[in-house]
Curated annotation (Swiss-Prot):
This is Translation initiation factor IF-1. Residues 1-73 form the S1-like domain. The keyword Nucleotide-binding does not apply. One of its GO terms (cellular component) is cytosol. Keywords: Cytoplasm, Initiation factor, Protein biosynthesis, RNA-binding, rRNA-binding. It comes from Mycolicibacterium smegmatis (strain ATCC 700084 / mc(2)155). Coiled coil: none annotated.
Amino acid sequence: MAKKDGAIEVEGRVIEPLPNAMFRIELENGHKVLAHISGKMRQHYIRILPEDRVVVELSPYDLSRGRIVYRYK
C-alpha cells in the first residue's frame, strides 16, 4: 500500500456499490463517504462486495470522497 503525503487512512464498511466502480462507504465513526477503487486494485481484479471491510484514503481537502486502497480478507 503506497501512502500519499497528507492522506488520511481510515477503515470502513462497504454499504452499496454504485455505477462506475464507485462505492458508498460507512466509516468507523459513522460518516458516509463516496469512494472509488485504486488503480492497483483494478489492475489485479480485486472484487469489492457489500459488507466488505476496507481501508479508505481520504484527501484532507475533501473528506466526503476517497479511494479504496485495501480490502480485508
